[in-house]
Regions:
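Polysaccharide-binding surfaces and accessory modules of carbohydrate-active proteins
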Residues: 2-125
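Low-complexity, Ser/Thr/Pro/Gly-enriched N-terminal "stalk/linker" regions
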Residues: 9, 126-129, 163, 173-231, ...
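Beta-strand-rich recognition/accessory modules
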Residues: 87-188
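Structural helix-adjacent loops and short alpha-helical linkers that scaffold large soluble proteins
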Residues: 188-189, 246-260, 309-324, 328, ...
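Glycine- and aromatic-rich loop/turn segments at beta-sheet edges
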Residues: 196-228, 268-293, 328-348, 379-397, ...
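Well-ordered alpha-helical segments within folded domains of soluble proteins
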Residues: 228-248, 293-311, 346-365, 393-410, ...
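Active-site lining segments of carbohydrate-active enzymes
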Residues: 285-294, 307-365, 422-428
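Active-site neighborhood of glycoside hydrolase catalytic domains
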Residues: 359-363, 374-385, 400-434, 464-492
Length: 553
């Protein structure tokens, strides 16, 4: 049953309020500082299956995960390790301001008459309890993106005698994550122009010829470039492929030649394992990437490079085959593929998480269907995916969702693909965050609907969802589920904002795009962007635009 109460900053009850539906009235003669909590108790369970969209997934962090960020631990709390049996968060962290247990819960809007709203949950005597706070409370700590817990952030409202407000409190299920409101395309430029700008930026600012590479990051102010290239993920093959595809379509031989040179560089530099290396750096040459264990190569990094190199053409077939041979040789009897491979032998060094799912599309497209299907049967058992990016260890991320969608669509396993897409879309913003007009995002009236939260560990918006644009469109058209195509249109529209149209546009150079849009109080102040251009952000926008043009999206 839904119940309302007024609470003081310390959580104790405050008297003098009446509640009629969602209307709250303060009836005392003196002002008071208090918040309002709407709380829903759910049936007893031993697995509450928490979901705060974009923020919290089940226990949220497995015990073996090396990256610290909020984790659910029944019956105990350790704030220094960001572990607790009760959590509260501000609404703008959430891709939809909502909280669920077992698919049931409460939904609200980001902003209320009392200030920004909040969500929270706890397990009390075996019963999940979910709530909405007006205004928000962040407890038992405030997560600022670092591994050091910040003090809790508790907001209250100053009530005047006789004041009455109407709050947005709705009971709901996971269908609440499908936004039905009309959508107005906020893109600054049409798809064709966005492709041209992204291609220009990728070639002009990120490409270097000796050796051929796409720099992972370059500064808006032309300071602090990172002279390194992953073979995929944050640089490398997928984005060289996009540049090659664009250059071929528009007849720009300079773009195509640069892309081919990057692909040649990657394909001709295999590790002793027979796979690609993970990363090239100016100081160390070819090396293993960002994981602290320098004997391991991350499977998703290798697999995406293999997939997009295969798509680039038969010229690089030998390198593709070498990588797939390693993946197949190391596949377990139950179908699992390694999450990481040893740099010398190619043998599995980790099975944790689901990063190995990224091999499936490459296996399918190369005709290795038996191995791909066995892997699909294994990964089809999962309802939470984790471990795709190199930088957050075993955290669940939106990138895991993209990898799962790409895998199951490649297999034409439409039921698994729908489940993967629905999970992935829990990271997608269904509303436009309110920004102060005194911030960069506020001045440019940035619309967040269609953007994805990177992960519970990295709470910023990013454009990586464009990597699975073709698969989402195919899924929509095969199943008749037009919501998948609509949200994919929104995803592409969102990131046709903030592609620099000219030098000086939002402080960037023409064609630059950023990795991070700060929609909440994490890493940097809300309303800013990271003033770096990334090869992957321009590359994935270019890829998404080229695919959209081909598909008539």
């Amino acid at each position: 049953m839904l119940a309302f109460r007024a609470i003081a900053p310390d959580g104790s009850p405050v008297d003098g309020f009446s509640f009629d539906g969602n209307t709250v009235t303060y009836e005392r003669d003196e002002h008071v500082e208090a918040g309002i909590r709407a709380e829903l108790e759910l049936p007893e369970t031993d697995d509450p299956r928490w979901l705060v969209p974009g923020v919290f997934y089940g226990e949220n962090r497995v015990e073996s995960c090396t990256r610290l960020y909020p984790r659910f631990t029944p019956g105990r709390a350790d704030v220094e390790r960001m572990e607790s049996d009760a959590w509260s968060f501000r609404a703008d962290r959430c891709s939809t301001p909502a909280v669920f247990s077992g698919g049931r819960g409460l939904v609200t809007s980001e902003v209320s008459p009392l200030g920004q709203a909040g969500v929270g949950f706890a397990l009390r005597n075996g019963r999940p309890v979910v709530w909405l706070d007006f205004p928000y409370r962040e407890e038992p700590l405030r997560y600022d993106g670092s591994e050091t817990p910040a003090p809790r952030d508790v907001q209250t409202y100053r009530w005047q005698p006789g004041e009455s407000v109407e709050l947005d409190v709705r009971e709901g299920d996971l269908s609440s994550l499908r936004r039905a409101a009309p959508f107005v395309d906020p893109g600054w430029v049409p798809v064709e122009e966005a492709a041209a700008l992204a291609a220009f930026g990728l070639h002009r600012w990120h490409y270097r010829a000796d050796p051929p590479r796409l720099l992972e990051t370059v500064g808006f102010d032309r300071e602090g470039d990172r002279d390194a290239m992953h073979v995929s993920w944050v640089s490398g093959v997928p984005y060289a492929y996009a540049l090659l595809r664009h250059g071929s379509r528009v007849g720009n031989r300079e773009y195509a030649a640069a892309a081919e040179a990057v692909l040649d560089h990657v394909a001709s530099s295999l590790a002793p394992s027979g796979t690609f290396w993970a990363q090239w750096t100016a100081t160390r040459g070819w090396t293993t990437g960002w994981h602290p264990d320098h004997s391991r190569l991350h499977a998703r990094t290798l697999a995406d490079a293999t997939l997009f190199l295969h798509r680039s053409g038969p010229r690089w077939e030998e390198a593709v085959r070498s990588n797939l041979d390693v993946a197949c040789r190391t596949q377990r009897e139950d179908g699992a593929l390694p999450s990481a491979h040893h740099v010398e032998t190619g043998d599995a060094v980790s099975w944790e998480g689901t990063a190995g799912i990224a091999w499936i599309p490459a296996l399918v497209e190369a005709g290795r269907l038996e191995e791909a299907r066995r892997a699909g049967e294994y990964y089809g058992r999962f309802d939470i995916f984790s471990g795709a990016p190199e930088d957050v260890d075993l955290a669940p991320t939106s990138e895991d969702g993209y990898a799962a969608v790409m895998a199951f669509v490649a297999l034409e396993d439409w039921e698994a693909a729908r489940r993967a897409a629905d999970w992935m879309l829990t990271f997608r913003y269904t509303y436009d965050v309110e920004f102060s007009p005194q911030t960069l995002l506020g001045r440019y009236e940035f619309k967040t609907r269609g953007a994805d939260q990177a992960s519970p560990a990295n709470q910023h918006l990013h454009a990586f969802g464009l990597i699975c644009l073709p698969e989402m469109v195919r899924l929509a058209r095969v199943t008749g589920e037009q919501w998948y195509e609509q949200t994919t249109r929104e995803n592409l529209a969102c990131f046709r904002q903030f592609v620099a149209r000219h030098d000086g546009d939002f402080g960037a150079r023409r064609g630059m795009t950023t990795e991070r849009y700060y929609q909440t109080d994490v890493f940097e102040a809300k309303g800013g962007v990271l003033p770096l251009s990334h090869a992957w952000t321009g590359g994935v926008l270019l890829y998404g635009c080229e695919a959209a043009l081909e598909l008539g999206l």
